[in-house]
Amino acid sequence: MADNLRTFATACQGGLVINQDPLTQGGQFAGTATRMINYEPALNGGYRRISGFTNTYGEVTGEADTPVLGVHVSADINDGIFAARKPASGNNYIHKWNNSTESWDAITTSGSPTMVGVSKVRFENFNWGTPKFAMVDGVNPASTWDGTTYTQLNGGQAPSAPSLVAAFNNHLFLAGDSSEPYNLYFSAPVDETDWTPASGAGVINVGFNIVQLKAFRNELFIFGANNIKRLVGNNIADFVLQTVTNNLGCVAPDSVVEFNGDIIFLAPDGIRPVSGTDRIGDIELATLSKPIQSIFEDYTANEDLAAITTVVVKKKSQFRFFFANQDSLGIIGAVRRSGQGGAGFEFSQLVGMEVNCAASGYIGDEEYVIHGDGSGYVYRQEVGNNFNNNPIFSLFKTPFFYMDDPELRKTYYSINTYMRAEGEVSVSMAVDYDYGDPDTEVSTDYGLSTAGAAAYYDKATYDATDIYDGNPSPVESTNIAGSAKSIAIRYVTNSTDPSHTIQAITITYGLGDRR
């Protein structure tokens, strides 16, 4: 019997893949997943159950039962965390977090802005000598905050109700006014309050309804639903509008983010980058999300793409797409760098987070990832082991492994799961055979449990909550008994346990016959 035993081994990498046939995926891409929810590509290899979020910032002052309209991180202004919500009375819709009192302080506005009809407030940081950020909402004139003074931008030819804002080459750009959706306005140089042509301000008709603006290096990209253009130059004297494409556009305004040295956006056929190639002035557009293409077809049919919220988690080389409904499946996209110096995109899905708006940024050397919900509360992500005291559901299912021969029956004896745990963790493991054939017996669930994570001394202080390494034994062994041509494994949790990472899998099996 021992001479007949074989070992199948695969490292967990490649992420969620649903565009391959079963034989190709189970052979060439064995480390990928056919289902993956609330796992993320781990920095140390494998798939990690995501961290939780907590209501660090409580409820933003405002009218009862109204959503958070926008959140923002600006490290150099006040304590760095800001949120917008419709006020119960008056006009003070923007609030700053006070670290000392652990409460929200209303910012006194001017110009009588209203939040009636506002669905989202967008922000843009800039610094032309003093750190500030601009705000737009599609109902009121744009405004700025410098930590002391709220200023409406309603002079000269400034648009009355822009919904889009970008800072580019010492000018503030505004667009998205529903009364003139094709116009792109820019301020005078180094003066966001001056919108007079004599000072160098101006307006450009781009020829299509503007969906989003994004400055990137020495270019300002202007997205439409079916077009993309870019603006180059330094001021009104040499600004030039150039066409990128007239056959492709952006379907979700808040999907446009800078990520991994590029701009990415959601197009009708999935996630795309706007990438400069080696040829000067050339632009390359390629779909990044081919492995999960059918998911975006489902989104087009069942979700409001205009309501997508995107946030970047820089320390993990990761972006996240959210929908406001916590039962909707969002997307994690991440860059996985290989030991050979290469890199590729991997994807997973998210569920269980109600995200009406989100933002991220560094305050000091610490990254803050925050979001606001539909009831006025602001949360910090990447904190803790639960979703605001609720358990985190996670699911990872492998492809069906057929060990080089899909027609040869095997007898399966054991599964070794190489797992790093960040504390005491229980994971339910189940086995499926022969592509879910109802005539093949399905195994019962198996329980994996770690004995707890190791701790270490940090700055001469013993801290049992810090993690030095995974569970003392990185291998969880499970004896199984089954006979089939192929086998797939599912890992499921629904708990408040610490996170764990599934890094690799081995299966011990024996060769059978063909029948």
Predicted regions and their residues:
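Surface-exposed extracellular loop regions of Gram-negative outer-membrane beta-barrel proteins
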Residues: 92, 220-245
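Surface-exposed ligand/attachment interfaces on beta-rich extracellular proteins
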Residues: 62-65, 152-162, 203-206, 212
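Carboxylate/His-rich catalytic cores and anion/metal-binding grooves
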Residues: 160-191
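Short loop/turn segments that connect beta-strands within beta-propeller blades
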Residues: 98-101, 146-148, 190, 233-236, ...
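Beta-sheet repeat architectures centered on beta-propellers
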Residues: 1-105, 112-132, 247-262, 268-515
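A short, charged helix-loop
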Residues: 189-202
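Short beta-strand motif characteristic of blades in beta-propeller domains
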Residues: 82-84, 135, 172-176, 219-224, ...
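Hydrophobic or amphipathic alpha-helical targeting/insertion segments
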Residues: 121-155
